[in-house]
Amino acid sequence: MKVKDTLNLGKTKFPMRGNLPVREVERQNEWEENKVYEQRQKLNEGKPSFVLHDGPPYANGNIHMGHAMNKISKDFIVRSKSMMGFRAPYVPGWDTHGLPIEQQLKKAGVDRKALSVAEFREMCRQYALEQVDKQRKDFKRLGVAGEWDNPYLTLKPEYEAQQIRVFGKMAEKGLIYKGKKPVFWSWSSESALAEAEVEYHDVTSPSAFYGEQVVDGKGVLDENTYMVVWTTTPWTIPASEGITIDATFDYAVVQHDDDERKYVLAADLVNADAELFGWNDVKIVKTVKGAELENVLCQHPFYPERKLVTMLGDFVTTDAGTGLVHTAPGFGEDDFNIGVKYGLDVYVPVDDKGYMTEDTGEDFAGLFYEDANEVSLKKLEEAGVLLKQMDYEHSYPFDWRTKKPIIFRATPQWFASVDKIRDQILGAINEVQFFPDWGQKRLYNMIRDRGDWVISRQRVWGVPLPIFYGEDGEAIMTKETIEHVAKLVEEHGSNIWFQREAKDLLPEGFTSEHSPNGKFTKETDIMDVWFDSGSSHQGVCAERDYLTYPADLYLEGSDQYRGWFNSSLITSVAYSGHAPYKQILSQGFTLDGKGRKMSKSLGNTIVPSEVIDKMGAEIIRLWVLSVDTSADVRVSMGSFQQIAESYRKFRNTVRFLLANTTDFDPAKNAVAFDEMESIDKYMTVLVNKFTKEILDAYANYEFMEIYKKLINFITTDLSAFYMDVAKDVVYIEAPDSKKRRSMQTVLYDVVVRLTKLMTPILPHTTEEIWKYLKEDEEYAQLSEMPEVKHFNNEEKLVDLWNRFMNLRSGVFKALEEARNEKLIGKSFEAHVDLYVSNGVQADLDALNANVRQALIVSALDVHPLSEAPENALKFNDEYAVVVEHAEGEVCPRCRMIKTDIGSDADLPTLCASCAEIVRENYPEALTEGLE
């Protein structure tokens, strides 16, 4: 008989390698065939609900790493909540309207002008659905569980109808109005943009300091005086209607050199500006308060017939410029507001495509607005009023889709009033819990400082604004007309608005004082796509009876504070008076390994499919767990390779646990806590503490904490300690001995707990593990999270063992020194003499454990500290260690060096302990002998 046949060497078919790219797909197919997600939902019927409402990604293109981080994070939460006793359905969604889809069709060669609006919209719809299918496949490949066959799409008729009803409720409350205001205007898209559709880039623009001659000084200034203004948009000078100053500033009237003209500047800026203009011998003629200059009139530098009025505003600064601001009400919000106050025209001499209109005169007409800068500067110079031209670096808004600069431009638009409900919205924010908590202030400040929301778009692929016009041009949007449109859209889809005449979209027999002849027209603009996604609380959460409104959680990137978090909050407070969410969790962006934004032009993109094909989705999932998603996250193949190593450690740990519990039946062989060995009690308490820490981290969305605690537990508590000690017990002790069964009870409990706790993170792997466990549920996903158990005197036990672990570290240090001195090779070759204080001796007695076994040495003798020799390695005044090579021979069964080899004459090669085990459990060894 061979010695190895008397050992309980662990065996398992659980493979060492995951082969994830292949096996993950097999598992996902199995889950789909067996409807595991649906089974989980049914299992949790009647339990408290937890609804994470999915922010819809835009249906265009393949998913990127930011998508993966977002969807996987959501999956962690939904899966963990499902296993923690909540009914946690997950309904994925897509944002399916908007300009990028129109642009994709244009790129594909579709001639929009050759099609009717309805035909073009149908092509947009088909394209969007194709993109949804592509992204759905990508998201499912990440292992994300949810209602993939029943997602919400903003193009679905039932969703569009609810969106129209949200609009209707806001109209009913007087929150929808039409106005001509400066809005972000994208000439490249030929449409207004919302704040959330704008991104800022640093640019260099031509700026000009120039004088505007006073023609009516109101008794304060004479006519040989010039107001000095500064602009960074010389192309807007043709639209100038006035000059804005601050009532409280001191303004100096100055002369310089031999120039007879006088110039007005903010007194605080005279020295800086004089140096900039190259003026010498500057004299201050007089100083006046800004308030004294109100209504002073100046000559427009280009148009002699136009006069510019001096106005008092509160947005003027002396940080730069002259303290006098060129004011064009058609091209800026501050300009517009003060222009309204002073009754100025809102003059907008730039068309939808960014070209100067005919009424600007022959020098400007037909020029692209940026080209008009040069003409303005030239005309100022010709007029002799250009004081300084210089480049100016500043942050400027761009269309986030076309990546082209935009302009502020006053156009007739439909607005949703934020101002009327601002206080209510701000109050609602205070009821929301934020992760991280700085998110509350960020959203609060954005709502506090934002203007009204321009909700109209001059495009065709979107939800129509359900507004009619009477014969007198008055807008008609009654509760009756809007609900009628909503029902038509619900039945036929929003294309019906573009297929039917206005009269066929109104309720039968509808009349209005605005149309005595019964003739009506309809609005041609569509709603901002942020109104689409921002209505999802009604289109999805309130509409599906198994969801809740408000939702428990919205989880998106930090850009959504000005996007979806923002628009959803406005529409929800307007609709029902409260926020659409109880909690907001925001995440950073995914950057490349050097901290740069990923882009095709830089060639620094890493896409999820690339990682999945090489390593598997589990590696991306574990990577998401490992990073601080609340901040920007760097992505590199190197980081995935590091995570693959952590995955390998996890897998190997589990493999050991499975291999050493194959002959363990928890129903028959489990040992009660009170009857366990001391070391097993300690590990049982530790794994329960670990369980609580992980469950708490799930509850607080602290993913990175889960990763840290997982890695620490499997490397420190298991691999470096318990599993190391376990080999000397589970391999060597009698198969059914209480000592071995005690340790197997713990090993099995640990692997079950690890499997359940990691199922939200690594479902493909844990389901593979589950097939080797003896649990009742068919799938790990259908199990519950492990219970946190508490035991009598557990803290006392942990403190005792923690003190021993400190002593163990000291012994290991002494063993390492002995190894360096070539006294020993492996630790089991050592004989350790331990010299301990009375306190340590009391601890060792209280441990009631095999200390030699816990130290993994062949021999151990314990002595009073007072007997420690000079050469002992001392640790404080608590203990000292001497290491020598153990005497005796190596037992071929336990691999320890023993002095009692051959004490059993029938088993002459074994130590006494092994001989006793073999004699009692393997009688054939006595007759056959051992080799």
UniProtKB/Swiss-Prot annotation:
Binding site for L-isoleucyl-5'-AMP: E556
Annotated Gene Ontology cellular component terms: cytosol
Enzyme Commission no: 6.1.1.5
Keywords noted in UniProt: Aminoacyl-tRNA synthetase, ATP-binding, Cytoplasm, Ligase, Metal-binding, Nucleotide-binding, Protein biosynthesis, Zinc
Compartments, record wording: Cytoplasm
Keyword Zinc among record annotations: yes
Entry annotated with the keyword Ligase: yes
Annotated positions binding ATP: K600
Co-factor note (free text): Binds 1 zinc ion per subunit.
Domain notes: IleRS has two distinct active sites: one for aminoacylation and one for editing. The misactivated valine is translocated from the active site to the editing site, which sterically excludes the correctly activated isoleucine. The single editing site contains two valyl binding pockets, one specific for each substrate (Val-AMP or Val-tRNA(Ile)).
Role summary: Catalyzes the attachment of isoleucine to tRNA(Ile). As IleRS can inadvertently accommodate and process structurally similar amino acids such as valine, to avoid such errors it has two additional distinct tRNA(Ile)-dependent editing activities. One activity is designated as 'pretransfer' editing and involves the hydrolysis of activated Val-AMP. The other activity is designated 'posttransfer' editing and involves deacylation of mischarged Val-tRNA(Ile).
Protein name per UniProt: Isoleucine--tRNA ligase
Species, as recorded: Ligilactobacillus salivarius (strain UCC118) (Lactobacillus salivarius)
